[in-house]
Structure formats: structure tokens, C-alpha cells
Amino acid sequence: LIKRFHIAKHKKQKEVVIWGSGKQMREFLHVDDLASAAIFIQNLDKKSFENNTKPRLSHINVGCGSEITIKDLAIMIKETVGYNGKILFDTSKPDGAPRKLMNSNRLNKMGWHHNIELKDGLKNAYDWFIKDMEHTIE
């Protein structure tokens, strides 16, 4: 969506169309937080790791624990990019799963928590896009 809003801004498009109703809920985690969680888990002592991955608990979910509607995400991206047009939702297209939220309680109880809030992560991603990817847009 960052790229789409950026293109719409620079081409002075009046609207950005997003599939679905915008009501579907999603959780987003910055890649740096995912890397941090992986290192945290890797550095656990063996006993602590085994105590938290007993049989039938072999997977450790990594997430931030909060969710946002696609509509609110789109508004946040629109503001981050500085796009002034409208956001339209094409309800003739599918929403996908109504909700996707990880249960990261086990990892949080081990002592790991995410550090980068969504708004900050979007700004970081857009700054990176401007610096390293904008030249790839036709």
C-alpha cells in the first residue's frame, strides 16, 4: 500500500482503491522486531527453551499483540505518505480472513516484547522506500 499511495500522490490521482470492505483486522510486526524475537529465542538457555516448548508447544508465535482494520491502516499510510486523495474500498473484491492476530503471550511471558509501533514502522518503511526504491517506479 505504501507504493500505491506514493504513486497516487505523485501522479495526482484522486483515489486509491483497496480490495474488500476495509473492516478485516490484521496484526503487523516490523521486521526488526521479528529479528529481535528470533535472537531472543536463540539466546534462551536450553532449560528455559525446553520449558516453553514442551510437547505440543513446539511453535512460538511472534507478534505485537494488537490489531488494526485495513481501513485504519490505509488511513495511517495515507497520512504517512502525505496523499490527499480519497480511499475507496471495492466491496466486490474479497476481504480474506476477517481477523488474523497472533497469540504471543508465551513469548511475552518469556520476556520478549516488540519495540516498534506500527506508525513508526510505517514511517521507517516509507523513508526507506523513498531512499532506496522510488527510482524503480515508472
Language model: regions and residue ranges:
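C-terminal substrate-binding subdomain of Rossmann-fold SDR/epimerase-dehydratase oxidoreductases
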Residues: L1, I7-E138
